[in-house]
Amino acid sequence: MDIRNEFLQFFHNKGHAVYPSMPLVPNDATLLFTNAGMVQFKDIFTGIVPRPSIPRATSSQLCMRAGGKHNDLENVGYTARHHTLFEMLGNFSFGDYFKEEAILFAWEFVTKNLGFKSKDLYISVHEKDDEAVKLWEKFVPFERIKKMGDKDNFWQMGDSGPCGPCSEIYIDQGEKHFKGSEDYFGGEGDRFLEIWNLVFMQYERSNDGVLSPLPKPSIDTGMGLERVQALLEHKLNNFDSSLFAPLMEEISDLASLDYASEFQPSFRVVADHARAVAFLLAQGVHFNKEGRGYVLRRILRRALRHGYLMGLKEAFLYKVVGVVCEQFSNTHAYLKESKEMVMKECFEEEERFLETLESGMELFNLSLEHLNENKIFDGKIAFKLYDTFGFPLDLTNDMLRSHGACVDMQGFESCMQEQVKRSKASWKGKQNNADFSAILNAYAPNVFVGYETTECCAKVLGFFDSDFKEITDAKPNQEVWVLLEKTPFYAEGGGAIGDRGALLKDDEEAAIVLDTKNFFGLNFSLLEIKKALKKGDQVIAQVSDERLEIAKHHSATHLLQSALREVLGSHVSQAGSLVESKRLRFDFSHPKALNDEELEKVEDLVNAQIFKHLNSQVEHMPLNQAKDKGALALFSEKYAENVRVVSFKEASIELCGGIHVENTGLIGGFRIVKESGVSSGVRRIEAVCGKAFYQLAKEENKELKNAKIALKNNDVIAGINKLKESVKNSQKAPVSVELPVEKIHGVNLVVGVVEQGDIKEMIDRLKSKHERLLAMVFKKENERITLACGVKNAPIKANVWANEVAQILGGKGGGRGDFASAGGRDIENLQAALNLAKNTALKALEG
């Protein structure tokens, strides 16, 4: 049975609108991941947005519960039901039908469509919900209905807001397999399994805890697809169902182990985590050091550790992830489209961790021998595993689980705090919270007038030294912080540097403004004092002319993000930025280097919007209204209820508090000067506009003129080609480079990197020297990695070998069975490419 389709069709026939699964990354700053079916309807339930015209909905929602409040990660593999990623089937009523219909629909679907026997079904209700008891008694005898308290049968969205009792349908799996003391209805055993939760949202809880009836009660239900699939197949464990069979087969083949072996928990961990990795990567989450990216990294590393237990010492998870992409390609087409990218990024992350996994495991095993009698694992060692070897804390605890031990959290946290102190970013002098507390008590937030003007009269409220201790006056040649009653200087934020400028007194320059920062809601400017100033002085604050150039680069950054999303896809999201007067730097999520065609398209799109002379528009509106308009926002930012929205007509709309040009025409022009990788899944573009754009054009024109003179040819390309030919002819002998040769099963294996020389000639020399050969030589040149490979009387084709390795470098290979070449721009992946080249060759030789 196709349970998903059966469920959606059933409720569609009952007048429900069918909604697609929303992304795993919700447009909700309070959630790390989408963790329930009701998330996409949250604003409807809370009344933020009006009810839809069809007040009934149904969906099959992909959910993630790993990290944050809802975190099942540590239980996966050890229980029958826990998953990081699962599908939640649900039906919803927005003030339309209520308990009677919800119970009727649920009973009909469970007994008729799913075919569960009514004698095996049990019901739980809230202890005060007599109405639900009476409704259930139409289908179930009273002795199979159990009243429970708030802990089990009362649901609420938060400390205040919509809430209500809930009712759950349980199924008796039979006493044949469950004979524990807790295996009774209402006990802690697994015999009676919850399959469907019906939430009756009928109250509003006020801030002081008082419950008031809602004028239009609603329904929210949830049922796990994986759980139902296992029940229909009479399996006692979700992982034993046909949903996971293709994954178990792949893992079994890779590890040469049987699923029913002692490694069964590890099979289940790898299968579950492969699903999570595939969907998260395909939906634009990338491996990172924080936030969702770090949760993804933790999931992958936990899977690798369980693979290690099964003897898998090389990258393997990417192959299981590939099976996930194929398995779900019919219901989630984007998995098929992004399969290559997903597998590549997974492989690269595996390679990075495998470099330290072996050493980390050695340290872990050695430390196990010194466990104290309380089985407390040294917190300092746990921190070293985390900090040096990349072992997330929950991974270390997971490894300790089988030894009945746990980490000394106090020791771990102590090491973490020490590291935070060492690495904490600081400006000249360090923040002193006690001093800031005194400042905040003494001064109200100063008024920022920089949106309206670049100059204003202002009163000096106070001066502060580098430790933010208040001083009464400022003397020439001192560097001090100043707090003005009102200020036109924009504080560093949103990637833009702080304003610079000057303070005038009596028509003379009294201080140079070096920088502006916001600390705890107060805008401070850093001054270099030229003329003595004191508290209470009236000054004229002037913003430097470079403000306009910063604004040009800031507006260009907005246009750049929109262009990237149009060219590369909606998975692109900001990962960091820097906006200065002479350049911009924009970091964004994308799995591979941009090729020349993509870069040209992005640059052309930005310039097209500049040449349209689009006016900027600044609006203030509620956060949800801004999101509904499609405004881009940073998940890491905490936004107020009302936000500032900057748009350039249809070209760009973002939440932003920064300074922008009034018209895109003022940007002048836009040029990308560099594209590079920052980390796995994060790319960086550096660009210029405005005066810097003009200056770059001047410099390039000058270089072009000098090149013509040097080449003695007005046609530079022709001159360069002539010079290259001359150099080639002048080379009397090839560069001799000796690379290490390994002999394996009679075949000479060469994999290495050279700094100079013709790598194709090197391959030819190696082929003439050896009767049996597998050789791949890499060379770094012009921000690219090129490779050449040769095969002679060996069990692999050169073109297949080269193409597989080239994908790691963000490129493709081509050639014949005996010789091939390739290249790519992901130079940061050179080591991973070397590892893959050698491992592929070794497998071919071993096979």
Curated annotation (Swiss-Prot):
> Where in the cell is the protein located?
Cytoplasm
Required co-factors:
Zn(2+)
Q: Name one GO biological process term.
A: negative regulation of DNA-templated transcription
Q: InterPro entries annotated for this entry?
A: aa-tRNA-synth_II/BPL/LPL (IPR045864), Ala-tRNA-lgiase_IIc (IPR002318), Ala-tRNA-ligase_IIc_anticod-bd (IPR018162), Ala-tRNA-synth_IIc_core (IPR018165), Ala-tRNA-synth_IIc_N (IPR018164), Ala-tRNA_ligase (IPR050058), Ala_tRNA_ligase_euk/bac (IPR023033), DHHA1_dom (IPR003156)
Chain positions recorded as Zn(2+) binding sites:
554, 558, 656, 660
Keywords, comma-separated and alphabetical = Aminoacyl-tRNA synthetase, ATP-binding, Cytoplasm, Ligase, Metal-binding, Nucleotide-binding, Protein biosynthesis, RNA-binding, tRNA-binding, Zinc
Q: What GO MF terms are annotated?
A: alanine-tRNA ligase activity; aminoacyl-tRNA deacylase activity; ATP binding; tRNA binding; zinc ion binding
Listed under GO cellular component are:
cytosol
Q: Which reaction does it catalyse?
A: tRNA(Ala) + L-alanine + ATP = L-alanyl-tRNA(Ala) + AMP + diphosphate
Q: Which PROSITE patterns match?
A: AA_TRNA_LIGASE_II_ALA
The catalytic activity of this protein is classed by the Enzyme Commission as 6.1.1.7
Cofactor detail note: Binds 1 zinc ion per subunit.
Q: What SUPFAM superfamilies has UniProt attached to this entry?
A: Class II aaRS and biotin synthetases, Putative anticodon-binding domain of alanyl-tRNA synthetase (AlaRS), ThrRS/AlaRS common domain, Translation proteins
Q: What class of enzyme is it?
A: ligase
Please give the function described in this protein's UniProt entry: Catalyzes the attachment of alanine to tRNA(Ala) in a two-step reaction: alanine is first activated by ATP to form Ala-AMP and then transferred to the acceptor end of tRNA(Ala). Also edits incorrectly charged Ser-tRNA(Ala) and Gly-tRNA(Ala) via its editing domain.
Q: Domains: what does the record tell us?
A: Consists of three domains; the N-terminal catalytic domain, the editing domain and the C-terminal C-Ala domain. The editing domain removes incorrectly charged amino acids, while the C-Ala domain, along with tRNA(Ala), serves as a bridge to cooperatively bring together the editing and aminoacylation centers thus stimulating deacylation of misacylated tRNAs.
Stored NCBIfam families: alaS
Report the family membership.
Belongs to the class-II aminoacyl-tRNA synthetase family.
Q: What is this protein called?
A: Alanine--tRNA ligase
Q: Which organism is it from?
A: Helicobacter pylori (strain Shi470)
